[in-house]
Amino acid sequence: MEAGATQKSLAATSLFAKVNNNGKFNRVNDISKDIKIKVLVLNARSIVKMEKRIELESYVKLHGYTIIAITESWTTPDISDNELGLDGFVLFRKDRSEIRVGKGGGVLLYVSNELRCVAVETLNAFKCESMWIELDDDSRANVIVGVCYKSPIVSEHELKEMFSAIRHAAKSRCLIVGDFNYPNIDWDSWECSNDDDEFVDLIQDNFFVSACESCYQRQ
């Protein structure tokens, strides 16, 4: 994912990449050069309505995205994958109901059918709102892509599950995107409140860097 594309496409979300660890990457942009992906990340606050999916599909075709990561999908088990489908994309989803009782939430990934990928069941088994896939790259080691959603109101157990999933993903080359609801972290200075320091430690200890320098919100 090129940095410019990242800045223009993110909507109040976060993107982290594993770089400078054992020589795997020299720059964040090396990831996109390896597997030629362009990622759109958004907090949809429901992708259930047909009108939203039609608008999303048009936007994706216009800008040539190959991976779409969505938080707050608001999907439920009574909505089939066929109803949520986008032309030319494979859908991977996890509804909130798979984790706990409650409305809203949920995450999903749309991956271009031109990319070879599989769901990472060991990571998807963690009881948190996250979805993980592995992109198959012929020339180098495969890349893990994950989307995470941390609700402003989240249990300690669910938060630990999410952090554990991220730690496991960090053993591989990976991109992690999502909405983590940590608005008080200063990514330039790493200053944060006591409530946020565990997440900052997680990012730093696993050699992630923030790949999002700016974002926009669309109503």
Residue locations for each model-derived region?
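A shared catalytic/ligand-binding motif for oxyanion handling
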Residues: 1-219
